[in-house]
């Protein structure tokens, strides 16, 4: 019962965060001010931070407007999934998405990360200050 509740909360958080970062005006080109290299490098750092079990450090990477919705209860299912995948092996393929919405610019990378027991596909999105606005692992 407890795991279902946490899974549901994680799904709701992922949906809310995705709504903030994805909208009608999506394109594959990154907006001015973002580069593929900077987004990729920051995503790698944020994925490694999330994997490190440093909840407070990972939470601090999110935009201020999202801080209150990031809880240990939504973080734990991610750690559980990570434990099932085993040790990190390598960062794999990437795809980049950019968006401008209501005067704000966003960039995201879809990153396939290889682990000993499989892969996790991350969608990691950033605002103009390179603060996290989306972190989905599936």
Positions of predicted regions on the chain:
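Alpha-helix termination/capping residues and helix-transition junctions
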Residues: 18, 52, 85-88, 129
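A short, local hydrophobic-aromatic micro-motif
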Residues: 22, 89-92, 133
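Short helix-adjacent coil turns
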Residues: 45-46, 50-57
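Exposed beta-sheet edge and beta->alpha loop/turn motif
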Residues: 96-138
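Short solvent-exposed beta->alpha transition segments
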Residues: 57-106
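Short, low-complexity N-terminal intrinsically disordered segments enriched in polar/charged residues
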Residues: 24-48
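Sec-dependent bacterial lipoprotein signal peptides
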Residues: 1-22
């Amino acid at each position: 019962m407890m795991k279902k509740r946490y899974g549901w909360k994680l799904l709701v958080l992922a949906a809310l965060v995705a709504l903030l970062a994805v909208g009608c005006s999506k394109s594959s080109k990154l907006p001015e001010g973002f580069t593929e290299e900077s987004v990729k490098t920051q995503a790698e750092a944020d994925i490694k931070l999330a994997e490190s079990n440093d909840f407070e450090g990972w939470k601090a990477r999110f935009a201020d407007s999202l801080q209150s919705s990031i809880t240990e209860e939504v973080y734990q299912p991610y750690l559980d999934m990570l434990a099932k995948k085993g040790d990190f092996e390598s960062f794999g393929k990437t795809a980049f998405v950019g968006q401008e919405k209501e005067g704000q610019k966003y960039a995201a990378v879809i990153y396939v990360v290889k682990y000993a027991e499989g892969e996790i596909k991350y969608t990691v999105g950033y605002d103009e200050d390179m603060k996290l606005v989306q972190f989905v692992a599936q």
